[in-house]
């Protein structure tokens, strides 16, 4: 059961990248589209961070929560999970082409991509690689999205690839307005992410 939760939590193990403002986005809401484009460009340059927080999941047969540490350095990530689901700890590391999941007292699992790891272990097809974008308050660039902006021209809601993402609060850190609380609603599970501390960094191209 713990491994099942860990794989779901591995949504967070993702790759940073680049995105432009384009026709794949449908923008509505109270914000200013031009200001959103500027905000998006600013956030897209953020390619490194350290996050400490909590994550929870609710599925038809499973629910639970745990603590989260997420280190991102451009295309490399190091995700560590512990807490009530832990019975030990889990660590997910990877970069393009190689993802590794280590679970205390259970073993090591590998796959070429986070999506492949989730499908292999759970049989679920999920947009895993979107999470590095969503956690920054950005839509993923490789598929269509519908955005609702708040009065500050930041994401309030995002619909993408069958997922609804709610941005409940933001905080300013080192010149970036970043999400503090996010809820993700999929067809058969809900994920809640509460970020206690953000340490954003722009590492370069």
Curated annotation (Swiss-Prot):
Q: Which UniProt keywords apply?
A: Cell outer membrane, Chaperone, Lipoprotein, Membrane, Palmitate, Protein transport, Signal, Transport
* A single cellular component GO annotation: cell outer membrane
- Chain's role: Plays a critical role in the incorporation of lipoproteins in the outer membrane after they are released by the LolA protein.
GO BP = lipoprotein localization to outer membrane; protein transport
Pfam families cross-referenced by the UniProt entry: LolB
* Lipid moiety-binding region (N-palmitoyl cysteine): 18
The record's comment on protein family reads:
Belongs to the LolB family.
Q: List, alphabetically, the PROSITE patterns matched.
A: PROKAR_LIPOPROTEIN
Task: State the source organism's domain of life.
Answer: Bacteria
Does Kinase count among this protein's keywords? no
Lipid attachment points (S-diacylglycerol cysteine): 18
Concerning CDD domains, the annotation shows: LolB
According to the record, the signal peptide region is 1-17
Localisation per UniProt entry: Cell outer membrane
Q: Which residues form a coiled coil?
A: none
Q: What is this protein called?
A: Outer-membrane lipoprotein LolB
Question: How is it placed in the membrane, per its record?
Answer: Lipid-anchor
* Subunit architecture: Monomer.
Annotated source species? Pseudomonas fluorescens (strain Pf0-1)
InterPro entries, per the entry: LolA/LolB/LppX, OM_lipoprot_LolB
